[in-house]
Amino acid sequence: MVKTNPKVDTENEKSYLTVEEFNAIRKMDLPKDFLDFLEIGFRTGLRAADILNLKKENVKLKKDDNGNSTGHIQGTALKTKSQTPINIRLDQKSLSILKDRMGNIKSEFLFANRSGNPYTIEYFKKYFRKAFDQLYPDMALHKSIHAIRSGNRKFLEMYNLN
C-alpha cells in the first residue's frame, strides 16, 4: 500500500502514475501479462493501443560492440493523425520482457490472449483498477490506464534519462 495520502499529496493529484505507485503495483500478485504491459507502458511511454498492437516484427534486436543485447521498438503510432513513426530504444528491463514474450508467444502480437488475438484495453483496465483498489483501500482513487504512459516522463526525469 502506498503511504502517502493522495488528497494531501499534490504530486498524486496529477493524472500520471507516480514512480511510487508504479513500484508498488509491480510487487502485487497480478497477472504477468498485466505487469508486462505496465512495465512496457511506463518505461517506453507508448500509448496503450500501441502496446496492444505490438508485433514481433516491431522489436528490433541486435548486439552492441561488447556483445550485449540491445533493442528498439519501431513502427507507426496508431493514435496520431500524422501516423508518427515510433523508434524507442529499450532499457534492459523492457528488452528482457519483450524478448521473453517473443520467445513464448505463438501469436504475432506480443500481448495476445490464448486465442492469439491482441488483448482488449478492458482486460488491462480491470487489473489497473484492481491495483488502485489495493493501493488505496480506504479511498475511491483510480487513475486512467493512460496514466501509465504519462508517468514515463517523471520516471525518465528521476533517472536522468530524458
Q: Which residue stretches match the model-derived regions?
A:
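Helix-turn-helix-type domain boundary/helix-start signal
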Residues: 15, 27-28, 84, 88, ...
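Residue-level detector of conserved, well-ordered beta-strand and adjacent loop positions
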Residues: 14, 18, 26, 74-76, ...
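Short, basic (Lys/Arg/His-rich) helix/loop patches that form interaction surfaces
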Residues: 27, 32, 44, 104-108, ...
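Exposed loop/turn and edge beta-strand positions of beta-sandwich/beta-sheet ligand-binding modules
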Residues: 11, 34, 69-71, 84, ...
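Basic, Lys/Arg- and aromatic-enriched nucleic-acid-binding interface segment
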Residues: 2-48, 52
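C-terminal catalytic core of Y-nucleophile DNA break-rejoin enzymes
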Residues: 79-99, 108-130
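Short clusters of hydrophobic/aromatic residues that line enzyme substrate/ligand-binding pockets
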Residues: 2, 59, 111
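Conserved tyrosine-mediated DNA breakage-rejoining catalytic core shared by Y-recombinases
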Residues: 19-20, 44, 53-98
